[in-house]
Amino acid sequence: MACPKDLIEMDDLVPVARVDTADLTCGECTDCLQMCPGLSPGTHAVEERMFGRARRDDERWLGIYDELVACWALDDAVHSRSGAGGAVSALLAHAMHHLQLDWALVCGRRGDKPWRAAPAICRNPTEVHQYSQSTYQLTPHLIGLYDVLRQEEESRGAIVGLPCHFQALRGIQALASPVGDRARKRVAFTIEIACSSNTLPSGTEALLVDELGLELQHVTRVFYRDATCEGVAYPGVFSAETVDGTRHELPLWRAFRTFKRHKTHRCLSCPDWLSGLTDVSVFDGDPNIFVASVNGTSDYAKHGTVLIRTPLGAAVLRSAQNAGVVGVRQTDLPPGNLGLERKRSRRVLHERGARPIPEPPIPGYVEPGECVDDDELLSVPADIRKHEGEAD
């Protein structure tokens, strides 16, 4: 999307040169390298522009923020359908109304392969709630902006995404090019979701085919954090529906353990649980949904923990609260966040390795401490694994 000559396209998850383009010479252009967070997320420079300063060492993992609150959707249907309380979809839908936005980029599903993630553009606030579910699958998310930035002259919108998406977005916005100018002017509101590492589509396919015994062509819908099934509590289960209307379920902990085998070096070496470069950041209110899934229920009420980073983020939150869209209460950061610990441990491991890795958000920062083995972090008692039919 950042290429001024439009020489790059996506072949599924892989960027490739367009074979239908006569002029494949880049000359001195390095726009794609400048905006790619796989080389450097550019966090230090973006924070200077956004906040007037870069993060301190004690802000290494959460970044710069003004307020930390618990937040959840007050609409029962939105709250029930959501993976973690509906804070993201409720705030996004309200932002579209409050800021008079024309579109919102969210993560949806492919029409031809409903088990595959794909970017989706919502054109009105009511559409947002169709996508109020977690998605644990890689997809070229920002490709969803291609048409709105290149073809719609005046529209403004919002983006929900993961840390790497916003690092790339901020890189695009820093470009001295037409697409950079459009991205600066027309992306008006941003919400990021914390990420310990994303998963290849083969991870979802392994759950459907190997664990549930389904044929992919029979799958019509996939939910990663489904809490609408009878007898299922937060944090939900992995579920799939098939053409005959049957719903098939797996405990969430089994999904997480399967996903471990379907990662990329880029995700595993990523230095950021949160980019810190958005108006709002959100993660689960329960710091360890894996253990909650093993136990069958959470000790926490279903909600999201929200970091407010900008005045605009604060304004949208207060407006949504005053309008009765979300519930808000002050909170502290619960200890023992599994996603953050997995991210930190893998970063320690890869910083000591020989392969190239993305730069950390603080230049030259080296993560202290020891790496905790992921098998230890995702361990499950043998009797529970046997009861749930997990293969050794």
Identify the function of each model-found stretch.
Residues 1, 6-28, 220-224, 250-258:
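Ferredoxin-like iron-sulfur electron-transfer modules
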Residues 193-206, 226-231:
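Short, conserved secondary-structure transition motifs
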Residues 1-7, 27-38, 162-168, 262-275:
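Local cysteine-cluster metal-coordination motifs and their immediate loop/turn environment
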Residues 87-96, 100-152:
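Portal/gating segments that form or line small-molecule/metal binding sites
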Residues 1-18, 30-52, 279-281:
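Iron-sulfur cluster-binding cysteine motifs and their immediate structural context
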Residues 174-192:
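A short alpha->loop->secondary-structure connector
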Residues 31-88, 375-387, 391:
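Electropositive, gly/pro-rich neighborhoods at or near active sites that engage anionic ligands
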